[in-house]
Amino acid sequence: MEENKSVAEGKAATGSLKESEETSAQNGELGEPEVQQTLKRTNSTESGGTGQKPPEEAPRRRFQIPRKSRDKRALQVISSGSREFEEILKILHSSYLDANSKASFSYKCARLVHNEFLEKEFTEKRRQLKFDGRLDKELVESYVFLLVDQEQMHSITEKGLHVGHSRMTTLGKPSMGVYLSRYADLLQANPLETGTTGDIFIFKVIKGKMKFVFDHIRNNQMDSFSGNGGLDPVPKHECHVLKNMNAVTALLGYRAFERTQYYFYEYGFDEVLKRPRHVCPYAVMSFGYKDELATRQPPLPTSGPVSFPTERSFDRSSFTLWRGQLLNKGKLLCYASLKSTSGPFIPYRLPERLDLDIVIKIEVIKKSIPAVLFYKETHNKPNEAKHGGIYSRLYEVVEKTRTGSHLQGLLQKIERENLALVKPLDDRGFMFLYFPSPMTSAYASAKTRLLHALFIYHESRLTQPVANVPVPPSFVPESHEFMPEVLTFVPALHFALHKSQSDTSADFNDVVEKHSRIYLKRRAEKLNKFKEYVLKPYDSRLDYKKSLYVAPRIKGHIESALRSYLFGSEAYTIPVDKAKEMLKENQRFQQFSPVSDYEPVEDDHDSNKYNKKCPVSYVETNSEKSSESTDWDIDKINGLINLIQKKKQSKPETDEPSGVGLKRKLDRQSEKAWKHRKCEENVHHDNEPGESAQSLISSLGGQDTDLRQETESLSSECIKMLLEKLADSCIDPAMAESLKTLKQNSTEELPSQKLKNLSQAHDTEREGAGQDQHIVYNDQTTDNQENTTCLSEEAQQAEGSHSDHSVLMEEKILDPPLESASPCPSNTAGNNCPAQGPNSLDLEMHWKLIPIAEANLTEEQLVYVSTEDALPNDPRAGHKRRGSRYSPLHETERQRPRHDRDYCRSLTTPSRTERNMLQSKHCHNGLIENTVLEVYNTFSEQLHDVLKQRDVPYMVPAAPPLLSSDDRVLKLSDCLCEQVSDICVQQYVDDLHTTLDSVVAAHINSCAVSRTGSPVTEIMAATEVHTFHPKQTVTEYPHVHEHFHVNDLHSDVREANPFSADHVYKVGEENAANGHALSHNSRDLSQETPEISTSGVTDLSEPHLAISNLINQMNPEVFNNLVKIITHVNKNSVKFYVHTEEENAICQNIKEYLLKLGNTECRPEKFLESKTKADKLLIIIQNEDIPNCIHRVPALVLLKRLPSVSFAGVDSLDDLKNHTYNEIFVSGGFIVSDESVLNPETVTIDELKKFLMFLEEINSPDANWQWKIHYKFHKRLKELGRLNTNALNILTLLTTYQKKNLVEILSYHLSCDPQNQQAPQLECLIKLQVQYMKQRHVLFLTEKDAARFPDYCDNGIVVTRMVDFMDNFSNLIGHHSPNNEEQRLSQLTNQGDETAPGEADSKEEEDMSLDSEDDTPPIEVCTDSWKPESQKQNISSLLELVDKDQTESPSTLNQGKTPTLDELQPITPVSVAGSTTGENSVSTGDELGSNTKDYNREVNLSHQFSHFSLLTHQTFLGSMYPTLTNPSQAEICFMNSYSQLTEPETSKNSERKQK
């Protein structure tokens, strides 16, 4: 019964096995081998059941087939202890390329794929292949792998693996098949990093018939970016595989991932299927990767004199602090890393490559360093160890590659020879690499193979917290120079940042700006809603962190915020200027009325200082006065005066307000007496009737806001007091009597017209008598002891008691340096006040210019009179010494003692009452004058800056004119004239005009003047005399004479008729701006030495007067045409240089031919020294000399930078005549680099991308740029690309740009590409320069020091770095931008002139051909009427051209053949299209200043015109005009041209056709 029972059980088991086999066969889970194995196991079990029950029956239960899962999900999770999980692990482990990968991969979760449709498709494909007669080895099932993410995993599980998921093209097009990995540990191109996690998708595949493909790396890499590379699928095949796939033996091998791929595809009837059916998803396994060593073995117990604890915790986490390469004498030993178990700290930052070439014996090291530092137990603590004053840290060196025995061989050598490798570090530090076994016997017994790295240094490398750093006792507060108000703006910024978190209405910076303005506005207005943000102090306790890493926080918004900041950083920026503007807009100043009481908070400090300097009695008196006066007190007035002074200052530099009421200190009085005197004077002020604020403002030049409240009572009182004072102080009895009469009449009401005339009379008196009597120095204060001509000592003391703060404030406005050089200056103290004493009767003339009550003076009486023509007592001659501060009289005045100057100034300064009353309600020296002065000062400063930048010598700058009214100037309106003041420049213009006329009449050479009424001759002669300097002045300033002479010459020639008032006015303004002080000084000196001046003027004016006589006889149209012809000839003239090693007949013929054409031979050195931008240089070289001589052209690098330099190669003279020469160095350039630029260890792929993109930007069809790489460097990149990812990326990048023709790989060079040669050498670069001679620039790119290549620049090669090439590209190749400063200077000096036609086109690149036919101007006949302005401008242009050509080409003056009168042809006038007046370009003073030295010799006219090659419609090389031999021939030539203008229009047309 038992036997039957066992048999029945066996049959039942067999039936269940058959059912499970059928089910598994339908699902495709088990193949035929598995079914056969299962049947074998069943049969053995069956046969064993016939006998007794075997003892192995109990263990048989472990192999029972589980019941079919009811889970219908696509991914079914498998437990880690199940049989399916173990089978998947076996599949993975058996598919490793490296056996050590088993310890690096850890698998966590496995999931089986359940997709019946895909499984049936797979089974159907297998049956189809078997039906087609495929071999059994082609039908074998295997497993392949793919690294996927979560999205790909679910898509593949449901739909299968479709084509197009990969970008590789190694085996075929990715759009027609799928790529899968052969090995389970080689899942991507880059090595896996430690800690990487992911999912591996396992596919069950049938390889079928495989196509073996050769490795076409170049084609694959070039087509990898387009995605169209690779082979097409082959019919009747299912897979592509690389032929040398089995050659890959290491994970880090060259292109190991690409070379171990399978390429699966499937053909349908007429197309490739999107999903190969013989690729079936099988399972998904989650993995984690760790590159750790195997568990270390604990060391044996120590035995020796030094005992250390032997227990060691191996669970401690380690930190990798450095990864890189270890090299020995440049040879790679291994890839290694430094690991530490004591903490993530390393004392030094090591480079990626460590070259260890120093070896020291261990015994030598022990003598200098304590041996205890080499023990690992010394460095158990996380802090650095210290013994014997030496700090140390110990790390372990771990080999990273694990593929060779390089490191093990190194360790054996160190152990055997008892050595240590040494690497010197910064700050007297060292790193020792040693094998630990020689140190102690304990390590010798352990036999550990870990190399140790010991860092030793003399100072601790730990960073101390801020709290532990001692603070120095003298703490200097931080200064915010870029924005002093930053402490005010930072709280506003905090407020705006807080508010902007909830405000997303606009860009971030706009929102921040809006809320910042709100905060600042509330702060300024002090609203109730305003709450000031106070910056909290930093808590130093935050420096002490308990743990190294902070607790995790929610950072979901960090990614979006960083992305918006990186791609739109401008939205997070507020410029400093805008922040300052926001602060300035919200500043609130205290508003007040000029006539109301006001108490400025900011001026309390000044008033307190003022009160501190006064005695107690003075303060008490002021308090009494302020209590009596209901309108104002002295403190308020002082504050108001300070404010007005700040507003009215013409320059920002002002003195202390406390010095406002100070008096000039006298040497006769002590400091104490001076202060006491000052207090007494202020006490006298209190006894005077008080003044209102309206009168004070009116006296300072201001106006009341309500004009209807003004009365005339104060004016009458002012006049009465003034006349009384004048009558008492005047010596002349007649004048005193007249003043008394006026005083009696002043008690009655004066008509408005009389008051106006009287006010103007006082103004005229101030102008004529001194015009500078109320000007004081800014750093000094005037003494209030004012004196007139014959006052007694008692009267002087009485006058000294009167003072007025307003007058003193007005006196301090004008600056004394400006006053001394004013274009309309006043008399200085030295001129008005002789040192004889106060009783001198010469002072009477100061009062002779006071008109008495509507007195009328003629025009001649008010005009300036020179010293020679004036009477002894004529006060009009007092102007002669006004001028530059460097005049001898002014120097004498400056060197006098201070009390003399004070005394003289006290004699000429009006009294307190007089000055107070002279300031009427409508003061003429008020606000308008100061506004004009401010504008004038700004203009002067800008002009001085331009002159300094252009290195133009100039004398003391001109000061603003002293503005005052004048009866002789017509008034626009009487009402308007009362409110504003007139600008007194007419008297100065008349003075200048009269002086110029007198100088011209005295010194002009009458015999040289052909027309007395010619404005050109008069202005030229007057200008030369006006700007002439004596010999001693020229010696002291050698360049000043040349500059000002030519500048004034051409500026005056450009002006209109000199006899018109407008012309004189313009000349006066120009002289005042360009050097009036120098001209006045020269005028004074010329009057003192007339014989020197007369002789100098005669010598200087002879050449120009001779030319002027000739030109004055010409018709203006003829002259215009001649000037334009000469201008165009100079514009198209080309200098040349023939470069040859030895002189030959060809070069000599070329030189002679070009010299006959009027061109100039010029060496490159001299051409570079000249600064003329219009010059052009053509360098000619024979074609056969180019390989050996082209790089020896002097200054070749500098010449290439200039666009006006061209190069031509010729074989004979005919090449120049027929335009068949070889153009050299046309445009563009090429770059050659050395090994430092393509070093993968130092250069990143981003830097090269940026460089190549820049090269692509500058490349154009007109200027081709290319990077030429030597074969040696390209080969090295391919070798390093197998192991170095950066090298592979660089190689791919170069290949991409090689297709764009921006990179060229040079062929093999025998001179520099061998291994023992350095590439590129200088000879190689010179050959490349000759080989690519059409490209203009040759650049040698290196990251080394440029000083190591000194000879490269001498051979036309520019040495630069990659960054410098991109940043300074324009400077390297010579791109020049126009000079803005020069344009400003030309606009400033040539205002009102129009631009000549040649100037408008000067910026365009001109034709460099020596015989250019382009741009030949058409022949026109000018029929404009006579215009003096045009003739004067033409004279200036002609003189400029003549002088310029004399200087530039003196060697070509007499080289042409001298023609006879019969050979002379009439010159047809040629003009460039445009107007004929005002279009001639005016040369600057720098160009003409160098030519003035030629003015002192007799200039022959033939020399001036003989070297011009005049252009017609014939070619520049085809015709040569005859030279002029003497002035008579020139006149005949010009007359012939003039006669052509009188012929009918038909003759002009016929003549034009003939030409």
Curated annotation (Swiss-Prot):
Ranges of compositional bias, category Polar residues: 35-47, 692-702, 744-761, 1448-1458
Biased composition, class Basic and acidic residues, residue ranges: 667-688, 888-904
Main localization of the protein described in the UniProt heading: nucleus
Coiled-coil positions: none
A GO BP annotation: protein localization to heterochromatin
Family per similarity comment: Belongs to the TASOR family.
Protein name, as recorded: Protein TASOR
Gene name linked to the record: tasor
